[in-house]
From Swiss-Prot:
Organism of provenance: Streptococcus agalactiae serotype V (strain ATCC BAA-611 / 2603 V/R)
Keyword Amino-acid biosynthesis: no
GO molecular function: rRNA binding; structural constituent of ribosome
Pfam hit, one: Ribosomal_S5
A cellular component term, taken from the record's GO annotations: small ribosomal subunit
Domain S5 DRBM: 10-73
Described function: With S4 and S12 plays an important role in translational accuracy. Located at the back of the 30S subunit body where it stabilizes the conformation of the head with respect to the body.
Record protein name field: Small ribosomal subunit protein uS5
Length: 164
């Protein structure tokens, strides 16, 4: 789901910049690919990729793509509602809620997504491939799977107190 209101100030973080080449008859064509995560630190986060001949232009394109690719992250206090595992390509990510004050125990690309989503207390583990784009996609996929207790109760047709 895309969010159209640009009134909210979004923070952006460049996760990776790669130099990519296309081999043509006359030699190599050099371009830059950027992976950027944007978020409002209040439950909304997105990522995007951009490619251009100059790094700043690639980053600008990635930011525009990220703004069109925002997801809502349900939170319980400063953490996530429940444990979740997700995969994308060869990358596997495990996200676990943590007690208040524990901080963000996550590395690299996962940390960027989690911090910009506004989650203050979480534990994560990246397994399998450590390619930044696949790690980011797996993390966002995991955040999409999260559901609050009220949503689960409504889906099952029972009250929240019966959810034990």
């Amino acid at each position: 789901m895309a969010f159209k209101d640009n009134a909210v100030e979004l923070e952006e973080r460049v996760v990776a910049i790669n130099r990519v080449t296309k081999v043509v008859k006359g030699g190599r064509r050099l371009r830059f690919a950027a992976l950027v995560v944007v978020g409002d630190r209040n439950g909304r986060v997105g990522f995007g990729t951009g490619k251009a001949q100059e790094v700043p232009e690639a980053i600008r394109k990635a930011v525009e793509a990220a703004k069109k690719n925002m997801v809502e992250v349900p939170m319980v206090g400063t953490t996530i509602p429940h444990e979740v595992r997700s995969e994308f390509g060869g990358a596997k990510v495990l996200l676990k809620p943590a007690v208040e004050g524990a901080g963000v125990a996550a590395g690299g690309a996962v940390r960027a997504v989690i911090e910009l989503a506004g989650v203050a207390d979480i534990t994560s583990k990246s397994l399998g491939s450590n390619t930044p784009i696949n790690i980011v996609r797996a993390t966002v996929e995991g955040l999409k799977q999260l559901k609050r207790a009220e949503e689960v109760a409504a889906l099952r047709g029972i009250s929240v107190s019966d959810l034990a």
